[in-house]
Amino acid sequence: MWLWEDQGGLLGPFSFVLVLLLVVTRSPFNACVLTGSLYILLRFFSFEPVPSRRALQVLKPRDRVSAIAHRGGSHDAPENTLAAIRQAAKNGATGVELDIEFTSDGVPVLMHDNTVDRTTDGSGRLCDLTFEQVRKLNPAANHRLRNEFPDERIPTLKEAVTECLRHNLTIFFDVKGHADMASAALKNIYTEFPQLYNNSMVCSFLPEVIYKMRQTDQKVITALTHRPWSLSHTGDGKPRYSVFWKQSVFVVLDILLDWSMHNVLWYLCGISAFLMQKDFVSPDYLKKWSAKGIQVVSWTVNTFDEKNYYESHLGSSYITDSMLEDCAPHF
């Protein structure tokens, strides 16, 4: 039965909801009616995941653990550039993770941040810059190997896809926001390059992005990305807010988000994979998701010992900043 937890179902989460509603309403009848209504709504609005065979073509091509170059391999080349894609292929990556953002005139380009300050010789918010302005920036300007990549430009989504396909790399499209724009842009890309249906996936920290993508095209393989405590703490573990009450509110929101991700949102979106920050991944964690028919991909795995552990012991694909050497994580 799909309902049972050990078969990847929803018995555990809905039992929790039922108990919670019993406490709140103090009425078994009302609690049962509300729980049943929530269940019906979830079933009605949820999407079926793509067939697991297709998902495994992307997550474990040739039935092997995949090493995915984060932002194209941001330690080995300027992140989110065509040079990074070429370098990732040269260094033996199975695929690349690429970040999608939009210029002020709606052109989808590769960029992780919402500003251009960190990676380029320019400044300002990407959404305030036209594509013509963005094209003049140097995305290698602040990279440690900038002298080796003197002629790079910020690529469009189409240019990046063309380069990846040329090198037979799988693609993890990481969508930073703009659910409607991103799903429309990606739908156009999948229409133009139909081989992407068996060679790529769309992932995001934002469930609304993944849900919108599934609404737009249910054939696209998708994944939710998650890091526990991401609302209340930065990537290196520091609190985001100095005011106690504000920090406490976001801690509570983190707890709710984490519960929702693991118990409801994965089912609602019909995902095929869950991209989890590596510090929270264990054999039991992989087993839990495997019972749901979902693959776990860990990020960011940046040391030789960690990679060996994922490949030899866990048998789990991972995302890394470097295909060549140990390096610090890029958040």
UniProtKB/Swiss-Prot annotation:
What are its E.C. numbers? Answer: 3.1.4.44, 3.1.4.-
Q: Give tissue specificity per the record.
A: Widely expressed. Highly expressed in the brain and spinal cord, followed by kidney, liver, and testis. In contrast, little or no expression is detected in the heart or spleen.
Q: Which PROSITE patterns match?
A: GP_PDE
Q: What post-translational changes are documented for it?
A: N-glycosylated.
Q: Which cellular components does GO assign to this protein?
A: cytoplasmic vesicle membrane; membrane; plasma membrane
Summary of activators and inhibitors of this protein: Inhibited by EDTA, calcium chloride, and zinc chloride. Enhanced by magnesium chloride. Glycerophosphodiester phosphodiesterase activity can be modulated by G-protein signaling pathways.
Question: How does the record classify its membrane topology?
Answer: Multi-pass membrane protein
Q: What pH dependence is recorded for this entry?
A: Optimum pH is 7.4.
As recorded in UniProt, coiled-coil segments are none
- Its top-level enzyme class, in one word, is hydrolase
One Pfam family hit: GDPD
Q: Which residues lie on this side of the membrane: Cytoplasmic?
A: 1-3, 270-331
Question: Under which name does UniProt file this protein?
Answer: Glycerophosphodiester phosphodiesterase 1
Query: Which species is this UniProt entry from?
Result: Mus musculus (Mouse)
Q: Which gene encodes it?
A: Gde1
